[in-house]
Amino acid sequence: MSDTRRRVKVYTLNEDRQWDDRGTGHVSSTYVDRLKGMSLLVRAESDGSLLLESKINPNTAYQKQQDTLIVWSEAENYDLALSFQEKAGCDEIWEKICQVQGKDPSVDVTQDPIDESEEERFEEMPETSNLIDLPTCELGKLEEIADLVTSVLSSPIRREKLALVLENEGYIKKLLQLFQTCENLDNTEGLHHLYEIIRGILFLNKAALFEVMFSDECIMDVVGCLEYDPALAQPKRHREFLTKTAKFKEVIPITDSELRQKIHQTYRVQYIQDVILPTPSVFEENFLSTLTSFIFFNKVEIVSMLQEDEKFLSEVFAQLTDEATDDDKRRELVNFFKEFCAFSQTLQPQNRDAFFKTLANLGILPALEIVMGMDDLQVRAAATDIFSYLVEFSPSMVREFVMQEAQQSDDDILLINVVIEQMICDSDPELGGAVQLMGLLRTLIDPENMLATANKTEKSEFLNFFYNHCMHVLTAPLLANTAEDKLEKDAVLGSIKTSTVCPDNFQTAQLLALILELLTFCVEHHTYHIKNYIMNKDLLRRVLILMNSKHTFLALCALRFMRRIIGLKDEFYNRYIIKGNLFEPVIHALLDNGTRYNLLNSAIIELFEFIRVEDIKSLTSHIVENFYKALESIEYVQTFKGLKTRYEQEKDRQSQKLSSVPSILRSNRFRRDARALEDDEELWFNEDDEEEGEAVVPPVEKTKPEDDFPEGYEKFLETKKAKELEDKENLPKRTSVGGFKFTFSHSVSAANGANSTNSKSVAAHTPPATSNGSSSKNTSLTTTVASTKGSLIGLVDYPDDEDEEEEEDTSPRKRPRLGS
């Protein structure tokens, strides 16, 4: 038999009775040797992988629903569905199934499975007819009918037979006529029996019966029967709610009567499932799988019908963005779109893509920009939900819109800034809306879901846009709440310092925690953009002011921000921290925390432990030299003693290097390892080159002058010229110190980083200067050097030239690269 491929979507029913999408592929029916029978195979259209392999069991009950669905159960708790793109494909596969089972393809349901014990039981009862005999539909037989319906639920074959009888004889409509009679007669006993009957029929789980029960003619009577639960003292008033309380609002008149009927039906059936029917027990869960499917595919049909009606959607958008539309009407329109987007989640991926593209083309994002700025909380909440659907569907689509918008609008009205402002101004004490919006912002600025093509890079374009136009809005509350606090540089370490402006308001603290979470995300996932911003705004210093907050969670957020920065092990950041003495507020917090063994204590110690374990030398030296006296009393962990040990080991290594180098090279010039100096400069200059080459974000509103790179660069050019002139006049001389001879290659080639032996040895082997500088003082080296500030500094300096050395601590071997 030849394979027939049809495009399908595979669904499975999960524990919550919701259909899970397992993928799109092409179905075929073929003989599988391993399964020893005809089977249904679905291969994914993306990569050809096997999505489904299911043997067509002769005893499995297959159901065909709504012309394009085939549903069946593989095991007791495993339901499957194939949703076909075309009716013809569904019909063809249905014929294959019926052919294997020996059934007429005109039926919509094949036989249910019969377990062996039940089959034997029926063989022992030859008098059992093919169909169940139903009692006549009259008041006196209601108890008998109820007993019959209840008794068949445990038997798959009897459920199927009862369903066939009910469908063929129009029995349900007769039962509903009896319901009306019982209500008119106030026949409570009869109404209780009808409740059991209708509930049992629902548990038969048959789509054909649902079509009858949920028709316009019958559904309200079905709801009426379900009001009379015998377990309740008084009947519920579900019909009153559905007809009077629940109002169907047509934001724009729906001209398609079939669509209107489908919407009414879906709402009422959902109400039956969610409100009226009791929560099913473990044994009853599978009884309502078809009801779940009925609702699911109804929603798919509603979305498809609305999407195809272009006039309807165009009119909705026109009214939504019209300034003349009153607030009540706009609220209804936004709520409609929220429901519409929620229903769209039932669509297959390719249809969902088309749906959101339709909304985008009609202008959903500019419309959201308007409604998110409204005062109505309900409207803003609905707009946020719609925005979340769009961001989840396509972050790139939203990013593209806001970047185009930035060319025509002020920063204040940009969509992302409107979203940030909504997050900042959330009036909910628990900041529920702000948390949701923060998650959406994080998705939008996440480089992991940004596209990179040959012609353009979304990441660099969008991050440039975000840091230029949006970051100042995001950080405004943080900067405002830390603006008046002045850090006391000369404060005695360990003293209690209380900030008068540090936010102690719980809601403000929560908001700042959210902002810090986003900024921490930026540190982890953005490179030079966030680095530029932190430096220009001195952001870490401002963040660490929050270590004074009485809310420990906010202090921890501030600490986490610093921990992520240190975790990058970037010397650029390390120099910034050292220069700003930014460990001071952290150590204040540790000491003020006292002997309390809490999360703050552990987090601070972990920060220092990380520095110790990773052996970050610059930070280790800074901490030990400046704070060890305050920390040495902490003995319940060995972290700080370990830092001191690391520091001393490094000093010993430098001393050993110093002892192996001739005294002529011992100079204040090399206060630290020259290689470390070169590495730092290489990092600094490379980053600057990278930033220029990648058209990085220009500095945003500088609050302090840029680092000294441009000025230093000018000094370097002046120095280089002076040095070249001097080299022409003063040739290098050979100098003798004891029995050791050393030639200084004081030439243009050396200044330009030529690989001469001597210039390399100075850079590679000169250790930090020690207190013993006498030997260099006695050296008879004669070199003429210009002594004015900013002029040339010799390769070897004398200890009394310290002031000049502070001005110029750059390795001469590295600098010439800048002038090239």
From Swiss-Prot:
User: Which stretches are tagged as biased composition: Polar residues?
Assistant: 750-761, 768-790
GO MF term list = protein phosphatase activator activity
Record-annotated membrane-spanning stretches: none
Please list the GO biological process terms of this entry: DNA damage response; regulation of double-strand break repair
InterPro entries referenced in this protein's UniProt entry, alphabetically: ARM-like, ARM-type_fold, EVH1_PP4R3, P4R3-like_central_dom, PH-like_dom_sf, PP4R3-like
Q: Which GO terms describe its cellular component?
A: nucleoplasm; protein phosphatase 4 complex
Any matching Pfam family: PP4R3
Functionally, this protein is described as follows: Regulatory subunit of serine/threonine-protein phosphatase 4 (PP4).
Q: Which family does it belong to?
A: Belongs to the SMEK family.
Its recorded name reads Serine/threonine-protein phosphatase 4 regulatory subunit 3-B
- Protein source organism: Xenopus laevis (African clawed frog)
Q: Which gene encodes it?
A: ppp4r3b-b
